[in-house]
Amino acid sequence: MFGQAPGVAEGAERRPWRGRAGRTLRRWLKLDEDEFYATFYCASVTRCYPGASPSGRGDRTPTPPEQELCAFWRDWELRIIRPRLIVPVGGLAIRRLLGLTGLADTVGNRYELGDATVVPLPHPSGASGWLKDPANRELTAKAARVIRAELARV
């Protein structure tokens, strides 16, 4: 599971995907908390909470220099762990991992990265307006089905 950055809840609890977005993510995947953490190693584009967005809605997107400072860790984790399934969550994680842009063009699709299957998801944050569109919610449901099928296979 590859996200953008830790949030406030994650920093306080020292565990990824602990806040509302994590609960939504687990609901999409039909996994309880224990199953989720037993199934996925969680990483992110950056290692530190970037702070609140200047608009006050959601978290600030890490700057390109912040992203580059943490790229070593992402590359190292991928080499060491050698995952069979990678789920980038949100536009930034998808761009950093696959070099692709546009959630509507990537969510619900399956990609290959080395020996790993990659299935992107949108970020489950309430700050994202992308999920308000019914067509996008269907793409998200499709991606969740693909991920569950991949989990059954690996």
Predicted feature residues:
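A polyanion-binding, active-site-adjacent surface
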Residues: 1-154
